[in-house]
Amino acid sequence: RREVLLAGIGPGSEALMTQEVREAIRNSDFLIGAPRMHKAAAACIKREQTEGELPDVKTAYQDFEVEEALRLHHDWQRAVILYSGDSGFHSGTRKLAERLKKNGCSFRVLPGISSVSYFAARLGISWDDALLASAHGCEFDAASALKSGCRKIFLLTGGKNGAGELCRRLTESGFGHVKVTVGEKLSYRDEQITEGSAKSLCGREFEPLSLVLIEEENDER
C-alpha cells in the first residue's frame, strides 16, 4: 500500500529535523518540495544513508502540482512531501491535505520545529502569549493589532511585505517606538538577528523570508 507523508522539516538546518522526519526521508522513494527543502533532505541523506538507492526528487510548490504528480506516478510507494517549519503553522500542508482528502488519498502528517518556536528559543522568551501571523503572500495590519491591545506579535514576512517595509508602516502609524527583532536565515550558519525600534529599522533591507518579533513595551499606550 502506498504511503504519502506530509513532513515539516523545521526552520531549515538539517540538524533541526525531527528523527521521525529523518527516517521518512531516508526510507522514501520519492521527495517533493521546493529547492530549499531538497537541499536539507540531501544533507540528511548524505549523513545517514549508507546503502541502497537514493530517492528521486521533484520540485513542486502548489498543492495541485503535488496532487498531479502523485496521481501520475503510481510506482511511488513511499512519497514524502517536504514543507518548511512545522506542518501546522502557515504551511502548504493545509491546502494539500484538503485536496488529498477530497480525492480520497490517504496520507499522514509529520510535524516539525516551527520558525516561531526556534526564534523564541534563540531569544530566550516564550511565545504562548503572542499573536502568530503571516504577511508572506498576504496582508497583515500590525498597527491595528497593536492598537487593539496586542503586545507581542510574531510575524512571517516575505515579498513586498518585508521587515523593512513593515517597520516603515509601523512608524507611519505612530508605532515607531515599538521594539522589533528580525530573524534572518534562522538556524543556518549565516543566521542574523537584528534588534531595534521600528523607526530605526525603517526601510532597511532584510532577507525576503524573515521572521519578525514586534513588542510593545510602553505601558502608557
What spans do the regions from the language model cover?
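Short amphipathic alpha-helix with an adjacent loop that forms part of the alpha/beta core around
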Residues: 67-74, 142-148, 199-204
